[in-house]
């Protein structure tokens, strides 16, 4: 006997509901992710490439590097890694207008002309982090002495010790994206901009740089600022992992770091690597040859040309303090960044260096919240972190990172220079961030 129509309809409806439920689970799992890369930094190993050991899903992967002979970037196993950012034109209200051709920023994805050099454009050229519904979650597990660490990078929150601090906005919300500048900051109509074909801003104090960045905000919104510490640490960790080395200049390129002058910097124009893809560098370093600029994750001059002022970390009377988010969800007790350290968290470390409070970085100090420069004695241009640390021993120092056009081998991703907020010079500038 045939089933009653109403029973057959009920059965069909139940089966369809089950199919829909399974599809929904698959979609959730796809968004949730399943990748956990890892690496360990061995503080006792002076060779910067031997100091990094792959863990978890990174085991067996081939490191990336710039081939200085062919002029091509060798991706190794990392070209399709989930954390790769995407170049875009970002409206001043924080929404994406359109994406750029990653191999030619003068074009949109569809091949038509972009606004990357248009100073009348109401927005900026930025890298969008967080793709395909997957954010970047990082967990830092310090060694017992806090001088080494295991670092894990995942496309989902594996446990509560994985954090996505760079994705937190001024309202304390965890969002899908955060944005970093493609170019060094330029000053156009009193706004700090990220556009191609521009001269870099110079001789501004930290407060002035922040005010120029915030001039991009629409109405009462608080999305735009200068570089942020938690962004920089995540990006530096990704660079260490991809290159399987702490020596970023050797892996990715020297940058514009040798024999620079104010005149050379003044003549530099952003956008020299618009057609060089996501990564590019040379092993020359001459600041007067602008095509020596380094490019990582689609961004020009992550080091070189100018020191880049960074918010979220300070040295206060010799001790490092920090803040990973605009709000207080990171455990800090003050909203917004400041130049006093009030409401910031203690990193638990006071840097040591030569009699001049400087030197090549030998040791970083790791906590679950970040990585902080510790020892600037015993390092060199080819050992440990291969980059420089300078700090003031009293008062408040605001970090400037990366190195400038006259830094030479001391420049790189691990370079930190803590200087008074009032400091201003031709070799120091800032770049935009947006959350």
Task: Annotate each predicted stretch with a short phrase.
Residues 57, 64-66, 81, 105, ...:
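Carbohydrate-recognition beta-sandwich/jelly-roll modules
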Residues 316-327:
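A short, polar/charged loop-to-alpha-helix boundary motif
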Residues 2-33:
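N-terminal low-complexity, intrinsically disordered "leader/linker" segments enriched in small/polar
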Residues 37, 42-43, 233, 254, ...:
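C-terminal, surface-exposed recognition/capping segments
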Residues 116, 120-123, 156-302:
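Short aromatic-cysteine micro-motif
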Residues 28-128, 135-136, 224:
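GGW-centered surface loops in extracellular recognition modules
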Residues 49, 135-141, 187-192, 409-410:
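Short, solvent-exposed loop/turn elements at domain surfaces
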Residues 132-136, 184-187, 313-314, 435:
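Acidic glycine-/aspartate-rich tracts in secreted/extracellular proteins
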């Amino acid at each position: 006997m045939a089933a009653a129509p109403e029973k057959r309809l009920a059965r069909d409806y139940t089966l369809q509901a089950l199919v829909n439920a399974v599809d929904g689970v698959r979609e959730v799992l796809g968004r949730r992710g399943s990748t956990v890369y890892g690496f360990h930094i061995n503080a006792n190993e002076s060779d910067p490439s031997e100091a990094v050991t792959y863990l978890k899903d990174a085991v067996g992967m081939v490191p990336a590097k710039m081939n200085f002979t062919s002029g091509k970037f060798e991706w190794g196993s990392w070209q399709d890694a989930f954390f790769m950012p995407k170049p875009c034109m970002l409206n001043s209200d924080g929404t994406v207008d359109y994406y750029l051709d990653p191999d030619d920023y003068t074009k949109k994805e569809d091949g038509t002309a972009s606004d990357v050099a248009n100073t009348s454009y109401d927005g900026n050229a930025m890298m969008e982090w967080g793709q395909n519904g997957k954010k970047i979650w990082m967990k830092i597990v310090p060694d017992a002495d806090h001088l080494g660490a295991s670092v894990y990078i995942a496309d989902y929150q594996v446990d509560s010790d994985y954090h996505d601090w760079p994705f937190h906005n001024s309202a304390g919300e965890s969002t899908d994206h955060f944005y970093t500048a493609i170019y060094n900051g330029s000053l156009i109509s009193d706004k700090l901009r990220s556009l191609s074909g521009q001269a870099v801003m110079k001789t501004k104090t930290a407060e002035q740089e922040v005010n120029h960045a915030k001039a991009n905000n629409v109405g009462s919104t608080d999305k735009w600022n200068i570089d942020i510490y938690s962004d920089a640490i995540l990006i530096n960790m990704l660079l260490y992992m991809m290159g399987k080395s702490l020596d970023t200049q050797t892996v990715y390129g020297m940058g514009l770091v040798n024999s620079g002058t104010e005149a050379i910097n003044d003549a530099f124009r952003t956008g020299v690597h618009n057609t060089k893809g996501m990564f590019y560098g040379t092993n020359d370093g001459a600041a007067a040859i602008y095509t020596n600029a380094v490019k990582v994750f689609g961004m020009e001059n992550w080091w070189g040309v100018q020191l880049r002022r960074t918010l979220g970390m300070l040295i206060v009377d010799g001790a490092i303090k920090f803040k990973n988010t605009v709000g207080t969800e990171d455990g800090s007790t003050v909203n917004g960044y400041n130049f006093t350290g009030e409401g910031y968290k203690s990193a638990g470390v006071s840097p040591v260096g030569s009699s001049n409070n400087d030197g090549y970085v030998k040791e970083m100090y790791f906590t679950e919240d970040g990585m902080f420069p510790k020892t600037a004695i015993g390092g060199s241009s080819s050992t440990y972190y291969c980059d420089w640390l300078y700090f003031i021993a009293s008062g408040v120092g605001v970090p400037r990172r990366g190195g400038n056009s006259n830094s030479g081998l001391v420049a790189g991703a691990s370079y930190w220079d803590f200087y008074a907020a009032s400091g201003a010079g031709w070799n120091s500038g800032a770049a935009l961030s947006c959350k």
